[in-house]
Amino acid sequence: MSDVIIYGGAFNPPTIGHLKIIEYLVNKFPNNKIIILPTNNFYKSKDIVSFDHRKKMLEEMCKDFIDKIEISNYEQTLDKYYGTYYTLQYFNHPLFVIGADSLETIHKWIKYPNVVTENRFIVFPRGNININEVINNNEVLLNNKSKFIICDDFIENDISSTEYRVNKEESYISKDVLKYIKDNNLYN
């Protein structure tokens, strides 16, 4: 069986940016099991909507290819925020999707450097961050360079959930997610 790919995030709400990454993964890694993993409600954000709402928004956004992915309840079962390292252990060290911005701060993650040395990553561009430079300037990353798949061919969009929550810009989210948000009176 091919590797499992985990794409985790708050998805508060899931945006067009998240959708493009999921579509890229489905197309680029058609033989891999792709698991979308919303964080639990103990995650750092104080204005996070419930896990159930975020999972349902993901289901709405991904309904055209829901048969090619799994949206996991795993983090909903946890009693606190444990960090990425423990999640990757639970899923038996899958490929883990991160943005270049997360790669820049990976040295601050729980169980660093083990989270790097024991796992593999799919890295997406973000902002003007030079991914190879980040790797080359960190000894742990450099010594584990073979564990990073860099998605140089991904066309980045700079849409964030935070920007949607602040600006309520409807073009940042899919029509299905927008309808769900309005129907459930979220992010007011």
Features from the language model and the residues they span:
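Nucleotidyltransferase catalytic core that binds NTPs
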Residues: 1-188
